[in-house]
């Protein structure tokens, strides 16, 4: 094999022999990114960023453009696949202590924030009823910022309400941000290769490493093939599974939907926002639900890196997973009992996981040192 630096980046990269299937999601995310950029380009060619024509242009893409329905569905459902993969990728990082590779973790969370911003801007583009109202509610949170809030919101909207300038700038941002994601992904991979991947046992992998290609690259192909198969099955047979019925109607600023909610991948943060009966408090909790991930490298106190041999941390981790799913479910429901109470309890449990990491680590160290 020729010793070229690009081949060294991927092919000759030494990787621990014992990394499991949970390490496959990085390559799956890269595949999702390529798919989103390609389908997004073909959609942008036919899309019109104008409030009178945006909805009609989506209908035109779906009905008249050859394979337009496939591009549109692949792009929409591909975004959901992207978020499924990234949430599993982050969960694996939390479970196996990958966050101790600080630079890689920080670049990864920055990637998540950029991806969420890109997805939000993209959700507005079809100019459906739910697109319009979700954008109104989420961007309106900026008004909670003391002193600067109203000016910031007006600046973002390009006027005193969401209108044509808002759609134009959201389209521009949705087009440019994927290139920032590509740059950040490259940085993420470079930083990862600087220190090397962790492994399920949390041991020093230097004693037992093999080349990434052909061993791990072929292992990655299995889940990659399953993901693509799953994606095409949904696109072909259940294309509207993640869509909101309200979004099949053109945006009408005079009619408010009965229940405003963003796409499912934002619902955990939206559920935390709704659980606090105060605008500024809710906005801060929403930001904190993502930003708290930045703290994990600094709150790790356990002697062992992964949770593989730490039962207390495992219990809290699986509580976090079930909490995440419960908040997402509760956020799809109306703001009424018992869903308000469920959202509040699960929001508290969500933050408890991150606050309990140092205490549990200290307790586990004590338990292990006890003869």
From Swiss-Prot:
Heme b b562 binds at residues 75, 174. GO terms for biological process: mitochondrial electron transport, ubiquinol to cytochrome c. Binds 2 heme b groups non-covalently. Gene3D superfamilies: Cytochrome Bc1 Complex, Chain C. Pfam families: Cytochrom_B_C, Cytochrome_B. The cytochrome bc1 complex contains 3 respiratory subunits (MT-CYB, CYC1 and UQCRFS1), 2 core proteins (UQCRC1 and UQCRC2) and probably 6 low-molecular weight proteins. The chain crosses the membrane at residues 25-45, 69-90, 105-125, 170-190, 218-238, 280-300, 312-332, 339-358. Heme 1 (or BL or b562) is low-potential and absorbs at about 562 nm, and heme 2 (or BH or b566) is high-potential and absorbs at about 566 nm. The keyword S-adenosyl-L-methionine does not apply. This is Cytochrome b. The gene is MT-CYB. Belongs to the cytochrome b family. GO terms for molecular function: metal ion binding; ubiquinol-cytochrome-c reductase activity. It is a multi-pass membrane protein. A ubiquinone binds at residue 193.
